[in-house]
């Protein structure tokens, strides 16, 4: 019995070692610096994607995902080095000073003509942008509460199906030409709330809309065409296959969902509207 147990343990260790070796082997000779993984982020990088503008801490959604991907590719935390780029600079075609870049890059056909994207590591939820004054009146993250709010939206937004089919407000939403008009209407008290993808809503509530607040977020599957974020790489990057394998494993194991829950639900305090 002891021999069987020891044999099983040895086989398990061998399988684990082989898996780690496979991960490491995938990236051999494919990174900018042999044995190192160079990851880019913004300058500065913002909450909740990177906490305190310190990606090396591994804190914040994208910082945590970056280290999880690195680990699956066979790189320890000590083997990861960070560089900074502007958002627009990295999208341009040409040679890159990083192996991959994480700055909430939405995967689009237009961008894929110039650079490579990984599989999605995040599918954006739709969030309810409002103001603290609306929250103070008793608005809650429930469909019953949302139905009674005055809504605004851009006429061409992909959020309209959620408004009409899911929220079903008691009064028709007011339609505007662009997001700037919607934001102005919120601040003027003409409307109570609007729907944006979660990253945009976080930014607007913190920087643009005076007294802005987030009431809640809908699961991504309730959006018709949700934004999906991918790792940005140089066109034709030999690392793409390795990165995609790592993301697939993190997705299938539930690790990616756990990181998202920690940094984009718990850390931001934006409740999910069921």
Spell out what each predicted region is.
Residues 67, 78-145, 220-222:
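Acidic, polar ligand-binding/catalytic clefts
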Residues 39, 44-45, 56-72, 106, ...:
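Bilobed "Venus flytrap"/periplasmic-binding protein-like clamshell domains
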Residues 75-77, 95-103, 149, 187-196, ...:
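Alpha-to-beta junction loops
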Residues 43, 123-127, 198, 206-247, ...:
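Periplasmic-binding protein-like
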Residues 21-22, 79, 158-174, 213-214, ...:
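Ligand-binding clefts/hinges and TM-proximal coupling segments of bilobed small-molecule sensing domains
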Residues 88-89, 105-114, 162-165, 192-225:
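A ligand-binding cleft/hinge motif common to bilobed small-molecule-binding domains
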Residues 24-104:
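Extracytoplasmic small-molecule ligand-binding "clamshell" domains
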Residues 63-72, 134, 148-150, 157, ...:
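Extended ligand-binding regions for polar small-molecule ligands
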């Amino acid at each position: 019995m002891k021999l069987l147990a020891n044999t099983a343990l040895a086989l398990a260790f061998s399988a684990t070692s082989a898996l780690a070796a496979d991960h490491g082997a995938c990236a051999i000779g494919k990174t900018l610096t042999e044995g190192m993984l160079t990851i880019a982020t913004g300058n500065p990088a913002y909450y909740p994607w990177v906490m305190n503008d310190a990606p090396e801490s591994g804190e914040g959604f994208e910082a945590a995902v970056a280290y999880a991907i690195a680990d699956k590719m066979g790189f320890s935390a000590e083997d990861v080095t960070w560089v900074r780029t502007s958002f627009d600079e990295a999208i341009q075609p040409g040679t890159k000073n990083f192996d991959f870049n994480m700055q909430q890059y939405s995967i689009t056909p237009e961008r894929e003509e110039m650079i490579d994207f990984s599989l999605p590591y995040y599918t954006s939820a739709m969030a309810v942008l409002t103001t603290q004054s609306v929250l103070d009146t008793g608005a809650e993250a429930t469909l019953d509460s949302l139905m009674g709010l005055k809504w605004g939206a851009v006429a061409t937004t992909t959020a309209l199906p959620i408004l009409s089919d899911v929220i079903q407000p008691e009064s028709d939403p007011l339609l505007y030409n662009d997001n700037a008009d919607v934001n102005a209407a919120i601040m003027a008290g003409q409307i109570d709330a609007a729907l944006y993808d979660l990253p945009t809503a976080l930014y607007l509530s913190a920087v643009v809309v005076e007294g802005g607040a987030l009431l809640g977020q809908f699961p991504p599957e309730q959006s018709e065409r949700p934004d999906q974020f991918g790792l940005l790489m140089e066109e034709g990057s030999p690392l793409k296959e390795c990165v995609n394998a790592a993301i697939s494993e993190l997705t299938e194991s539930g690790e990616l969902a756990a990181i998202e829950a920690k940094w984009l639900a718990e850390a931001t305090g934006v409740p999910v509207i069921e």
